[in-house]
A protein has these predicted regions:
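Glycine-rich anion-binding loops and their surrounding alpha/beta cores
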Residues: 1-148
């Protein structure tokens, strides 16, 4: 990373999830120009709820797809919505870090809270659901073309 001037975020929930979690603390490693910063974040510190692990358990692929559609359409609140907000924010922070490494000078919690607000606005405005439908349409077209 140091020789390429690259930046990265790596994170893990203390519950063992390979993502930021809403069940307790998550650890984030932020790599910028070869320097590694380590941060612990808790969902309450970021403005989302803390939940029991059973509240974020998935199911069958069809069930999970339905839940994803409901979350992105703004039809579901609670643990699943909050974990989606948290991880969407992490993706946005990672993008910001990759395109502007100087953003690492601001506290990670502040950046996450700001991006949670962006993710929340995307869901609440319908933009997230609209983007999902666009992705589904393109995916179906590509699949149909590959079978032709």
């Amino acid at each position: 990373f140091q020789t390429r001037g690259a930046a990265a975020l790596v994170f893990r929930g203390d519950d063992g999830l390979d993502e930021l979690t809403v069940t307790g603390y998550s650890r984030i490693w932020e790599v910028v120009n070869g320097d590694v910063g380590e941060h612990d974040v808790h969902p309450r510190d970021l403005g989302v709820g803390e939940y029991e692990p059973k509240e974020i358990l998935g199911g069958s692929p069809a069930h999970n797809a339905q839940i994803a559609r409901e979350v992105l359409a703004g039809e579901r609140d609670g643990a699943v919505r909050d974990i989606v907000l948290l991880n969407a924010a992490a993706g946005l922070v990672a993008y910001e870090l990759a395109t502007n490494p100087e953003s690492a000078e601001r506290p990670i919690r502040q950046r996450l809270v700001e991006q949670i607000d962006v993710a929340r606005a995307s869901i609440d405005s319908g933009a997230a659901a609209e983007k999902l439908e666009q992705v589904v349409t393109v995916s179906q077209q590509l699949h149909a073309n590959s079978e032709a």
